[in-house]
């Protein structure tokens, strides 16, 4: 997919629409450490170019029928729906903007700067949440939980809204809310997808990008 090619969804889930999660690409960050907009950064895939935002959107579209981009209304992916931020700041603002656009729907979230997260892992998050009736499902490994590749149910999003209203913007602490049912993917669950430090490589700097690209070429 080239940056100029409008995106089209490919997912075809069998569940009723209202029961399916909406795929949310988080792409609203300021990219201060990178020095330019990461979401619009073009990388090679199989000889073709795609942006990091397009890559995340493609992965989510393998799992979700509805996929949109929470990019503070910047329209970083041609043809994809662009969402304005909600209240708060950082990823929480993107999540709450999406929650406002899709009330009563769960959200399957993937940040554009997590380019190595596979669609199969995202699908596992959906399954684990559905099987256990979880309000929040996310991976957890020795470096901690990863809230930017996670499934947020309606109750978790409501809790996030209350936290943001009280000035708490971090997603990392949301799982500690006592009224939420939280499901974690353990390192054993993650093992089929590769080493966690490679799955969750975060492209914050040009050096991070170079490392991820080198790993891709090696693999």
Name what the model sees in each region.
Residues 7, 11-199, 210-217:
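Nucleotide and nucleotide-moiety/phosphate-recognizing core
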């Amino acid at each position: 997919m080239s940056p100029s090619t409008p995106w089209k969804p490919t997912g075809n889930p069998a569940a009723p629409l209202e029961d399916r999660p909406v795929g949310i690409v988080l792409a609203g960050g300021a990219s201060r450490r990178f020095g330019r907009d990461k979401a619009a950064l073009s990388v090679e895939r199989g000889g073709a170019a795609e942006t990091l935002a397009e890559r995340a959107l493609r992965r989510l579209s393998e799992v979700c029928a509805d996929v949109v981009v929470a990019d503070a209304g910047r329209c970083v992916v041609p043809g994809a729906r662009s969402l304005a931020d909600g209240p708060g700041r950082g990823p929480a603002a993107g999540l709450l903007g999406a929650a406002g656009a899709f009330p009563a729907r769960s959200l399957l979230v993937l940040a554009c700067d997590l380019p190595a997260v596979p669609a199969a892992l995202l699908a596992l998050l959906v399954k684990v949440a559905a099987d256990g009736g979880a309000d929040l499902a996310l991976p957890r490994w020795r470096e901690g939980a990863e809230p930017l590749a996670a499934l947020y149910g309606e109750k978790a999003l409501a809790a996030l809204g209350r936290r943001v209203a009280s000035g708490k913007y971090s997603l990392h602490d949301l799982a500690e809310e006592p009224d939420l049912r939280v499901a974690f993917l353990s390192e054993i669950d993650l093992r089929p997808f590769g080493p966690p430090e490679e799955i969750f490589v975060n492209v914050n700097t040009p050096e991070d990008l170079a490392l991820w690209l080198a790993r891709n070429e090696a693999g």
